[in-house]
């Protein structure tokens, strides 16, 4: 587009009809005898900004109930009912707090504790999808204090801003999930006198943005420099969910309960194991600083997945692994089915890997890849996958464990 200054051939703004000297500049539309003046351009930009901000406002009447949130999570995550209920209530409370700023409500940041593959990340992601708010994921192990090699803590804000397509108002009501938070535990309970740039130092840096601050972030991420344009993002209404496996946490909690239950009326260990709940003091003992623990008022514990749950994960949720493979085979005109024995064996092997639901795909991947590589096969219409085919997938084709069209 071409910018014109002055009265050139009596050109007028096609929007307001004014011409020089009433306006300073005209911008000509390419290939057309149409113009817009600098003042109409400014006015259009402001209208776009206002409409965008209006679209970013949170409307309480659109907030789902806790039961609706749990029902939605049930479609994606198998089991973990207590965790889903706690998350649903916490999320509703958080966004009600945004809708009623005049009421003094504590920010409901959440700590998810559970073994690898139990659904921590998927729960957080599904919440954001249902609420239609921007969502960003960060790995705590990649974060360092400002000035050290690695990702600045504020880069997690940049990722959220990018997910919001640089709509600051939308980003300021988004959700950030920080995984592997247990990996930045400090080495001892005492205050460190030496630099721990990826442990206690990161906790201190995260503390500021989690409790609420106006962060000055470079829109494209990376390190700040003096000549760089920065974007202001207020984090006080961003919901932070952090998660980790916290291995050996049970031993810390058990040691506490054993000490307190010595003598008359002491609980039995078997009962204690079922009811074990982690307290803030356990998290501090593990290596989280007290101030950081204090900014995570809701601690949600996810349970390890048994084989029954893993079988359900294979087949039931939206995007279940079995459904995905059935779709891929369907594209080749093949109806793929799995026997109950096959599903049980996959779940059994995944359980042995101790990687939860993540292990399911790993168990099936090679067998499915080998079979898909052979397709298409003329006349092949059905495949019935059994437990033995996990290790010998091509036996399906070689031994007639398939059906061809007549």
From Swiss-Prot:
NCBIfam families cross-referenced by the UniProt entry: clpX, PRK05342.1
Record function comment: ATP-dependent specificity component of the Clp protease. It directs the protease to specific substrates. Can perform chaperone functions in the absence of ClpP.
Domain ClpX-type ZB residues, every copy: 1-56
GO cellular component: HslUV protease complex
Organism: Deinococcus geothermalis (strain DSM 11300 / CIP 105573 / AG-3a)
Keywords: ATP-binding, Chaperone, Metal-binding, Nucleotide-binding, Zinc
Coiled-coil boundaries: none
InterPro entries the UniProt entry points to: AAA+_ATPase (IPR003593), ATP-dep_Clp_protease_ClpX (IPR050052), ATPase_AAA_core (IPR003959), Clp_ATPase_C (IPR019489), Clp_protease_ATP-bd_su_ClpX (IPR004487), ClpX_bact (IPR046425), P-loop_NTPase (IPR027417), Znf_CppX_C4 (IPR010603)
Protein name, as recorded: ATP-dependent Clp protease ATP-binding subunit ClpX
């Amino acid at each position: 587009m071409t910018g014109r200054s002055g009265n050139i051939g009596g050109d007028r703004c096609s929007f307001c009809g004014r011409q020089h000297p009433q306006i300073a500049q005209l911008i000509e539309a390419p290939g057309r005898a149409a113009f817009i003046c600098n003042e109409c351009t400014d006015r259009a930009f402001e209208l776009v900004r206002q409409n965008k901000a209006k679209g970013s406002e949170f409307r309480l009447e659109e907030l789902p109930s806790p039961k609706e949130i749990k029902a939605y999570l049930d479609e994606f995550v198998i089991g973990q009912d207590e965790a889903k209920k706690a998350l649903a209530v916490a999320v509703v409370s958080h966004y009600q707090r945004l809708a009623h700023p005049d009421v003094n409500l504590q920010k409901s940041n959440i700590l998810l504790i559970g073994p690898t593959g139990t659904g921590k990340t998927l729960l957080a992601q599904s919440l954001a999808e249902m609420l239609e708010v921007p969502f960003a994921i960060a790995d705590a192990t990649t974060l360092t204090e400002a000035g050290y090699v690695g990702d600045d803590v504020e880069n997690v804000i940049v990722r959220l801003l990018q997910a919001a397509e640089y709509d600051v108002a939308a980003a300021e009501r988004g959700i950030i999930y920080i995984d592997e938070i247990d990996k930045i535990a400090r080495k001892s309970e005492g205050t460190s006198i030496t630099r721990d740039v990826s442990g206690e130092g990161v906790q201190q840096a995260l503390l500021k943005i989690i409790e609420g601050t106006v962060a000055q972030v470079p829109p494209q991420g990376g390190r700040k420099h003096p000549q760089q344009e920065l974007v202001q993002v207020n984090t006080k209404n961003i919901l932070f969910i952090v998660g980790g496996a916290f291995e050996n946490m049970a031993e810390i909690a058990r040691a506490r309960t054993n000490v307190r239950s010595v003598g008359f009326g002491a609980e039995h260990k078997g009962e204690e194991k079922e009811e074990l709940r982690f307290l803030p003091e356990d998290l501090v003992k593990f290596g989280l600083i007290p101030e950081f623990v204090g900014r995570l008022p809701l601690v949600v514990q996810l349970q390890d997945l048994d084989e029954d749950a893993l079988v359900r994960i294979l087949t039931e949720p939206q995007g279940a692994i079995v459904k995905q493979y059935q779709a891929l085979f369907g594209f080749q005109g093949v109806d793929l089915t799995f026997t109950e024995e096959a599903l049980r064996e996959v779940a059994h092997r995944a359980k042995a890997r101790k990687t939860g639901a993540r292990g399911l795909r790993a168990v099936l991947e090679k067998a499915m890849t080998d079979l898909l590589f052979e397709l298409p096969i003329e006349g092949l219409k059905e495949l019935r996958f059994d437990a033995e085919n996990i290790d010998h997938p091509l036996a399906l084709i070689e031994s007639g464990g398939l059906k061809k069209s007549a």
